[in-house]
């Protein structure tokens, strides 16, 4: 069996506040071989890691990410909503995550959050940052904005891309070919063994999301997924270890 990438969804987000350095570091301790994160642009053009386009769910701030400078965002508490022990956590920058994983072999799945907010120049900034760390071979750029992914592939053919989608896409590997994407980041219920086989024949792979139940993890391992995105990298690591032993 080929090695399956164990992607920690927003870091180890079941154990730590999502998309924080604590979550990213903890995911590596729990056996993750990949980290999934979300990137947006601050008002002054910095690459900040946060899922929501607004601040209120995961910080003590309010309003839109795009309307704040980095200096303002760095003052926010990005951890107390999860647990008081994480009150010192701040919104991280993409370069901080890349520095963390640079010498680890970890694959990083960077989701471009550019559907609700069409951040001008986001693709170029992410690609430039990845290249500055010489990590192109260990990056997958994903998005629900497939125009953006096509642009990424045109700008950086060496960086893998993955189309994010829910379900119901007919022969998604053929669609992925049309936008030159390498991977299918499907909602996990949309992944069946025959789909994985079809994708493999077309040179595409599946990285389903977000898979937290062990039974579903086993199903996707057996189906041939190349990577699995989960809030529980420790659970997945244990199952993958058992699969190798058997």
Region locations from a protein language model:
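Phosphate-group recognition and catalysis centered on beta-loop-alpha active-site segments
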Residues: 1-246
